[in-house]
Design a protein with these regions (language model features):
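P-loop (Walker A) phosphate-binding loop of NTP-binding proteins
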Residues: 10
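ATP-dependent small-molecule kinase phosphotransfer cores
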Residues: 36-100
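Hydrophobic anchor at the beta1->P-loop junction of P-loop NTPases
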Residues: 7
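Walker A/P-loop
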Residues: 16
Length: 176
């Protein structure tokens, strides 16, 4: 059985920080999809100049559509190329309103038993409130309320009132 632990959740919840602490505790490498995604996207045609042009000329929705079209490939590749490690997914890479894209992400994550959704609170309103103090609020409510991460997760851990080390230990306990 593989030992990958995959952390998902909205921006600012602490996936990368908890992932680093967990990787240190378990003596596993840490892989952050945010660090690798654009390299993966370029393999299938993503172009920074084109993304910039779309952003400048066609506004946010067109830019989001362009970038989001590459995200399932990034998720697939980070899982195919990295084993026996802690992987933290980007805040938006596991959420999509596009059924075909979400199905690809769901299929890629389905074989993994240790997919852990991190959220500040069981209460979505409280999660949004907490996350807004950490990051730009524009997209957070959508990410917290979307059913996508809940559908992908095998475990859900609420971070409210816990230290980073306590969250790390809870992830470790639930995934071993």
């Amino acid at each position: 059985m593989s030992s990958e632990i995959i952390l998902i959740g909205p921006f600012g919840v602490g996936k990368t920080t908890v992932g680093r602490l967990l990787a240190e505790k378990l003596a596993l490498p840490q892989v952050s999809l945010d660090d690798l995604c654009y390299g993966y996207y370029q393999e299938i045609g993503w172009n920074a100049q084109e993304a910039g042009r779309i952003y400048e000329q066609e506004a946010g929705d067109a830019f989001d559509e362009y970038t989001c079209s590459f995200e399932p490939y990034g998720v697939e590749q980070v899982l195919l190329r990295n084993h026996d490690c802690v992987i933290d997914m980007g805040g938006g890479q596991t959420v999509s309103e596009n059924e075909t894209r979400f199905a690809r992400v769901q299929d890629a994550l389905a074989p993994y038993q240790n997919v852990v959704l991190l959220l500040p609170s069981l209460d979505p309103e409280e999660s949004v409130r907490v996350l807004k103090t950490r990051r730009s609020p524009d997209f957070l409510e959508y990410l917290v309320r979307s059913p996508c991460n809940y559908a992908l997760a095998k475990h859900v851990i609420y971070t409210e009132g816990k230290s980073l080390e306590q969250v790390r230990d809870e992830v470790s306990d639930r995934t071993q």
